[in-house]
Amino acid sequence: MDSDMDYERPNVETIKCVVVGDNAVGKTRLICARACNATLTQYQLLATHVPTVWAIDQYRVCQEVLERSRDVVDDVSVSLRLWDTFGDHHKDRRFAYGRSDVVVLCFSIANPNSLHHVKTMWYPEIKHFCPRAPVILVGCQLDLRYADLEAVNRARRPLARPIKPNEILPPEKGREVAKELGIPYYETSVVAQFGIKDVFDNAIRAALISRRHLQFWKSHLRNVQRPLLQAPFLPPKPPPPIIVVPDPPSSSEECPAHLLEDPLCADVILVLQERVRIFAHKIYLSTSSSKFYDLFLMDLSEGELGGPSEPGGTHPEDHQGHSDQHHHHHHHHHGRDFLLRAASFDVCESVDEAGGSGPAGLRASTSDGILRGNGTGYLPGRGRVLSSWSRAFVSIQEEMAEDPLTYKSRLMVVVKMDSSIQPGPFRAVLKYLYTGELDENERDLMHIAHIAELLEVFDLRMMVANILNNEAFMNQEITKAFHVRRTNRVKECLAKGTFSDVTFILDDGTISAHKPLLISSCDWMAAMFGGPFVESSTREVVFPYTSKSCMRAVLEYLYTGMFTSSPDLDDMKLIILANRLCLPHLVALTEQYTVTGLMEATQMMVDIDGDVLVFLELAQFHCAYQLADWCLHHICTNYNNVCRKFPRDMKAMSPENQEYFEKHRWPPVWYLKEEDHYQRARKEREKEDYLHLKRQPKRRWLFWNSPSSPSSSAASSSSPSSSSAVV
């Protein structure tokens, strides 16, 4: 009913617009975007094309479509009626062409054949059925000109013909055909919501101008303009690539545990029951146990062990005056709580004392973790007797021992353990000291608790108590706390060089490190120190082209799994070193740190173009591909500025990079050409309009008076006898 009223309204011009073109060029999508305000999702864009026609009766059954058909163009109220058609060449479209006011002829910029059919098939057909109707040429699917065609083709159905880059038509191709046919040319994208209003507003203008020639008495058509020029579409600026840091290397606990089974670079021999020898590593034992830390810092050549306040050294966490005493006091309180929770059991020191060959008896512990200060005796050479210093140890001394893997003699520390310590439970304790974990299925939990008490490893006592109380799930938090504490202790040992067994000679100095930690965290280091190389048997390793700041960052990463920056750190040199050591996770962390710094500098209005040019080829050569992609993006999106400031450097780029710049530069070349053409055409249009306005006579005669016109009233007053008005 409302649709009939549109035809009856005297000042509403009803425009019939027929949309034609090949199949799958986007005719129906374009109509739906105008009539229904429909948008196209990525899924719909890539879906298999199904031939459809938008029904004209939507104007009768849908009030929203009818409301959207009404518009005002150049002060003229119009009602636009869109007619969709099939694109098959054999279809009979004479009914659709009947009484059409304007024809919109569509082709796809990704299908050259559809543009060829514009001249050979569609335009002749239009002129045959409606020779007086104006025609508008429209290039659809503009978004494919800047889309990632590889991703588009992957997402399409398997048998669909892929879109090739050389098939994408530049704007001048469509403009040439339009100029040859003498019709306006526009481009649209339903995905980008560009050009839809331009197409139909100018189609309305073309129809109204054609109608004005026949219905010259309609004064409201006097100010209708000819179809306007379309400003070129600037593709959206591509977002910078996101630096993705992969998950850190797994099996962080497996590698230290493997060092117990395969004691590479071992420097400690633990002797149990005079016959069992277990090889271990100072750095792992001392960073997991305060007792072992004090033990390995003892002076074995001079002086006498005084008491609990002079154990020969203090733990890395106990180095700050009064906080040292507070730490021991706090530690004892926690030890008492752990002992109470685990029932404070202990194993008799010998089977004979417990009553022959029966099982080991349990008795309440009397040490409670307090160091005894009765002094120690001395062994011949470098060594000490420790039985009065701790119940866990008998003696410690340095001696030449055969390496279990290389079979070469070298100096090691030999520690004889108390006879009550059994090999099986002690290995479980060592596994905890290396990994922070305790197997719930361990059978000798009592003996493990006994050893943990002797070594004052109260967290392990707590874990045993949790298992006995069926609360093993609580051990996960203890393990996490273990790793946090050991990470802090390892960092202090790295800073002070405590227990180091290798020194790296660098360009600007030396830095001490620990082979066991390096072997368990880096395959490259494991191959160097564990293989048939000179570095495996020497305490000094030369690292050329490496600075202390870079090596310190690498060591902290290998020791703690975290990246730590410093003011004197060179990002690119660190990436080079990390790539040499086959550490892709550290490379990614450094890439992220570098990109963050560059983006912060950009926000502070600092020019980073020169740095990006330097980083680009270095990053590509040293496998920092994410940083290289970011540099490529920055250069492409600032291409003109970079070329203006660094012309020689840009010309010296590799052919691959130059090809990438030409393909992905923003704004693209086709846009710059279109912008230049648009500005020239706009100036020509303004000049034509000025000349046209200048040629028009200033006084025109009308058939009736126009009392509202000031010029007519002036003319009437000057010539009262005249029956006409001049405007």
UniProtKB/Swiss-Prot annotation:
Result after altering residue 461 to H: In DEE64; pathogenic; reduced RHOBTB2 proteasomal degradation; does not affect interaction with CUL3; no effect on interaction with MSI2
UniProt xrefs under Pfam families: BTB (PF00651), Ras (PF00071)
Tissues where the protein occurs: Ubiquitous, with highest levels in neural tissues. Expression is also detected in fetal lung, heart, and brain.
Phenotype upon changing residue 94 to C: In DEE64; likely pathogenic; no effect on interaction with CUL3; no effect on interaction with MSI2
Basic and acidic residues bias locations: 315-324
GO molecular function annotation: GTP binding; GTPase activity; protein kinase binding
Mutagenesis or variant effect for residue 132 to L: In DEE64; uncertain significance
Region (Disordered): 304-333, 703-727
Modification note: Autoubiquitinated by RHOBTB2-CUL3-RBX1 ubiquitin ligase complex.
Disease: Developmental and epileptic encephalopathy 64: A form of epileptic encephalopathy, a heterogeneous group of severe early-onset epilepsies characterized by refractory seizures, neurodevelopmental impairment, and poor prognosis. Development is normal prior to seizure onset, after which cognitive and motor delays become apparent. DEE64 is an autosomal dominant form characterized by onset of seizures usually in the first year of life. Seizure types are variable and include focal dyscognitive and generalized tonic-clonic seizures, as well as febrile seizures in the mildest affected individuals.
Known role: Regulator of cell proliferation and apoptosis. It likely functions as a substrate-adapter that recruits key substrates, e.g. MSI2, to CUL3-based ubiquitin ligase complexes for degradation. Required for MSI2 ubiquitination and degradation.
Protein name: Rho-related BTB domain-containing protein 2
